[in-house]
Amino acid sequence: MPYKISRAAYAGMFGPTVGDKVRLADTELFIEIEKDHTTYGEEVKFGGGKVIRDGMGQSQATRAEGAVDTVITNAVIVDHSGIYKADVGLKNGRIHAIGKAGNPDTQPGVTIIVGPSTEAIAGEGKILTAGGMDAHIHYICPQQIEEALMSGVTCMLGGGSGPAHGTLATTCTGAWHIERMIESFDAFPMNLALAGKGNASLPAPLEEMILAGASSLKLHEDWGTTPAAIDNCLTVADEYDVQVMIHTDTLNESGFVEDTVAAIRGRTIHAFHTEGAGGGHAPDIIKVCGNPNVIPSSTNPTRPYTVNTLAEHLDMLMVCHHLSPSIPEDIAFAESRIRKETIAAEDILHDIGAFSIISSDSQAMGRVGEVAIRTWQTADKMKRQRGRLKEETGENDNFRVRRYIAKYTINPAIAQGVSHEIGSVEVGKRADLVLWNPAFFGVKPEMVLLGGSIAAAPMGDPNASIPTPQPMHYRPMFAAYGKLRTNSSVTFVSQASLDGGLAQRLGVAKKLLAVKNVRGGISKASMIHNSLTPHIEVDPETYEVRADGELLTCEPATVLPMAQRYFLF
């Protein structure tokens, strides 16, 4: 007779299985396990008296014979592709297999071989996600990188050279600074990439930045986002296969949103803070989220719309864009960008999948450690205010969760040409993974892996007899040190710079990898679960936003999950 175990006891031993539901942090979001790749009665688990022991769940296989380097056991995987339970095998810094781990000599159906060289990470009762990607970074200070890593971000793309005033406001890196920044990247356990300045009316200056290692080009209004600059930048980007990100002209000095759309001429472009509070044609830049060639994204200060959103934005904007509260024109500029109507509409546009990406805008009207938190707060607010999505098929929030996790994992990776390496829990991709306790999901990771090695984790007193005594706080782990630091992460650059000998010229230790397929091969339709293109109208007097004729409005939140309950200090 097979042994029977209660569902509760099974979940306590091996984690939830098909049909079980898990609450995400203190939100109203509930996921349900759709599929379990493990085998009942043959589960592997590490520990005293458990399964992964010699001759039992551990085989005699060497690495050469197929044993993986690390196995993550019985994890609940939350990914754009689905919500399911599986063992995950890591090998040579990549995801080697997703399925059933164990010893093929004694167990049936094994797809991940556990051998004597295999390390074990206990995923029972835990959630595993891809590392996050933040595609809107101002490299104002290097300390941002550790802050982002500890929040579950494993790739940062942006521009700048430190607290220079150009970097405080924009993410546009000049050619010499690009090379110097790439040299500095050896010091950081993080996948990194740089954007060059896209504001030029002739090709040569942009080409020099791409050849210096820019993975993308950024058009920013503070440098003059004119129709001529837009057209030239996209023309060069098409030639070199790099993405263009745009922050449009808030003051409408060189044209209106229609002029910008005309200058883009149907070419693929990533529109930053498309709602407009972070910058862009006032009051109607949000209209471009209905264009099939525009990939719209948000920065996290407006995520989600709360009773405090408007008040904090005015001060943020004055500081970030070098404005003076004593100059009336500067105050008028700032006030033109902050509109409660478009911010409220942004919540709903995210929920219906019309906005595709969420990023931070780090220290330049954004919080680098809150990309995940703000994403899930938005999802929670929308469930409370709008109810279940029509796409849901069960008594769960699986589709909504898949839509929202795509906004900071796979979609920015696709938009910026790195989805062949990162962005999802997928065989063959880099093992840049984050393990979460469900009660702390999206807030405080339990473990962050880079290239298959542990880079960060909460850790107690190093002098204690066990790892858990206070003070417990996030600390860098071994993937943040020595040669492993440069072997466990990469720098993304343009293919043209690699062809031009950038790696040899700079002599950096980190591997340089090329971005690819960011021009005609992708569009809004490439944004997984977030590809809707409604017709957007903005009333120029009231700022009311309509999508396909329907008014988009919602109340500001007065209370949010994932907030003070998790941060006592």
UniProtKB/Swiss-Prot annotation:
The annotated active site, in chain numbering, is: H321 (proton donor)
Enzymatic reactions: urea + 2 H2O + H(+) = hydrogencarbonate + 2 NH4(+)
Where is the Urease domain positioned along the sequence?
A: 131-569
Compartment(s): Cytoplasm
| Major location (coarse) | cytoplasm
Sites where N6-carboxylysine occurs are at K218
Q: Which residues bind Ni(2+) 2?
A: K218, H247, H273
> Which protein, by its recorded name, is this?
Urease subunit alpha
Q: Which organism is it from?
A: Agrobacterium fabrum (strain C58 / ATCC 33970) (Agrobacterium tumefaciens (strain C58))
Quote the record's binding site residues for substrate.
H220
Which Pfam family is an annotated match for this chain, by its short name? Amidohydro_1
Entries under InterPro entries matching the protein: Amidohydro-rel, Metal-dep_hydrolase_composite, Metal_Hydrolase, Urease_alpha_N_dom, Urease_alpha_subunit, Urease_AS, Urease_asu, Urease_asu_c
Q: Which GO terms describe its molecular function?
A: nickel cation binding; urease activity
> Which residues does the annotation say bind Ni(2+) 1?
H136, H138, K218, D361
One GO biological process term is:
urea catabolic process
| Domain of life from the UniProt record | Bacteria
**Record-linked PROSITE patterns:** UREASE_1 (PS01120), UREASE_2 (PS00145), UREASE_3 (PS51368)
Instruction: Write down the NCBIfam families for this protein, in alphabetical order.
Output: PRK13206.1, PRK13207.1, urease_alph
Pathway-wise, it operates in: Nitrogen metabolism; urea degradation; CO(2) and NH(3) from urea (urease route): step 1/1
HAMAP family in the cross-refs:
Urease_alpha
